[in-house]
Amino acid sequence: MNTFLLDTNICVHLLKNEYGIKEKIAKVGTTSCFLSEITMAELLFGIENSAPTRRSENIKRFDNLSLLFSNRILSISNVLHEYAKQKANVRRIGKPVGEFDLLIGATAIVHGLTLVTRNTKDFENLEGIQLENWIAP
């Protein structure tokens, strides 16, 4: 059975009910999908950065997402060695990756999850990562 780590951009589309992400999650099984605590932090930043008129609705959506994934939000504490290895490698080959993307990618690698992202190019230089784009035409 395939298991998946949903990148932040996929969660944003889920929260906005876009691109059939909710249906794709239902198809693979909600329990087969995980989030990184980095994604949660990025979503919280998005809420803090949103217009005051949208903030309460965004908080509700975030809270619902948190409940849905309550026991499937993965910590980064056990992926730090993989993060460091991947960061050194992408620096060595001259293909830098953003810090949060590195942590999310390392989480997918360590847990043996396929990373679902709209931005596959951001992760393609990580060794051993498996990627899927659920939004690609």
What is the predicted role of each segment?
Residues D7-N9, D101, N119-D122:
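Acidic active-site catalytic centers that drive phospho-/nucleotidyl reactions
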Residues K24, E37, E82, D122-N125:
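Residue-level recognition of specific faces of alpha-helices
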Residues M1-S36, E48-N64, L68, P137:
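Short, well-structured N-terminal submotif of metal-dependent ribonuclease cores
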Residues G105, I109-P137:
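Acidic, PIN/NYN-like endoribonuclease modules and their adjacent C-terminal/linker elements
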